[in-house]
């Protein structure tokens, strides 16, 4: 499937930072592609530049404010639609890792596609590295949170920082934490 466009995301579950979705059509074979989660940071960084050199690609960022306003599913779907719109002249076949196509007829879906298809692996790497670099770049602006260490994910240290300092403007305010006494509808439980 030479003209297949692989699509994957990074940042669906973190407490802070953007959702990043990438679409990739490989123009040349690239050795070493795999799901970004199983590759070392060094390997992802090396492959990132090679993927950009040897592909047609499009990357979409949805910030925390948009995620809070519209929801993660809306952001994911609108990002996929933007990718399809930007890459449709190069491909008529779009495949995403996962179990839903969000009602987008042209989009095929397959669980673990990021480990099975080079194009989806490449998209996984572009999304992950783009998001990680963004979190590293903004970390000095939010020194209390150490985003460069956990990239906004819900680590123990990150949750402790939220407990101490509250959420910043790049935190997802609609993502509630049981560790903070928040329930599923966002109301703090009574202390009495």
From Swiss-Prot:
Gene Ontology terms: biological process: DNA replication, removal of RNA primer; mismatch repair
Pfam family, one: RNase_HII
Cofactor note: Manganese or magnesium. Binds 1 divalent metal ion per monomer in the absence of substrate. May bind a second metal ion after substrate binding.
Gene3D superfamilies, alphabetized: Ribonuclease H-like superfamily/Ribonuclease H
InterPro entries found in the cross-reference section: RNase_HII, RNase_HII/HIII, RNase_HII/HIII_dom, RNaseH-like_sf, RNaseH_sf
GO molecular function, one term: RNA-DNA hybrid ribonuclease activity
Protein origin, superkingdom: Bacteria
Root EC class: hydrolase
CDD domains tied to this protein: RNase_HII_bacteria_HII_like
Reaction equations catalysed: Endonucleolytic cleavage to 5'-phosphomonoester
Subcellular compartments: Cytoplasm
GO cellular component, one term: ribonuclease H2 complex
Parts of the chain that traverse the membrane: none
Entry EC number(s): 3.1.26.4
Cofactor: Mn(2+); Mg(2+)
Coiled coil: none
Residues in RNase H type-2 domain copies: 2-187
Keywords on record: Cytoplasm, Endonuclease, Hydrolase, Manganese, Metal-binding, Nuclease
Residues bound to a divalent metal cation: 8-9, 97
Function: Endonuclease that specifically degrades the RNA of RNA-DNA hybrids.
Similarity comment text for this entry: Belongs to the RNase HII family.
Name listed for the protein in its UniProt record: Ribonuclease HII
Lineage, opening ranks: Bacteria, Pseudomonadati, Campylobacterota, Epsilonproteobacteria, Campylobacterales
């Amino acid at each position: 499937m030479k003209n297949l466009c692989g699509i994957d995301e990074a940042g669906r579950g973190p407490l802070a930072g953007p959702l990043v979705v990438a679409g990739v059509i490989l123009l040349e074979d690239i050795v070493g592609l795999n799901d970004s989660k199983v590759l070392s940071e060094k390997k992802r960084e090396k492959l990132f530049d090679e993927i950009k050199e040897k592909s047609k690609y499009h990357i979409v960022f949805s910030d925390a404010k948009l995620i809070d306003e519209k929801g993660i599913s809306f952001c994911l779907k609108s990002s996929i639609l933007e990718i399809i719109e930007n890459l449709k002249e190069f491909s008529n076949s779009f495949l995403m890792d996962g179990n839903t196509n969000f009602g987008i007829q042209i989009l095929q879906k397959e669980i673990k596609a990021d480990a099975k298809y080079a194009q989806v692996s490449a998209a996984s790497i572009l999304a992950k590295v783009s998001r990680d670099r963004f979190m590293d770049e903004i970390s000095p602006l939010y020194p209390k949170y150490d985003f460069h260490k956990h990239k906004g994910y819900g680590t123990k240290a990150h949750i402790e920082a939220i407990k101490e300092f509250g959420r910043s403007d790049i935190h997802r305010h609609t993502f509630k934490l049981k560790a903070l006494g928040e329930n599923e509808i966002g109301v703090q439980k009574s202390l009495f």
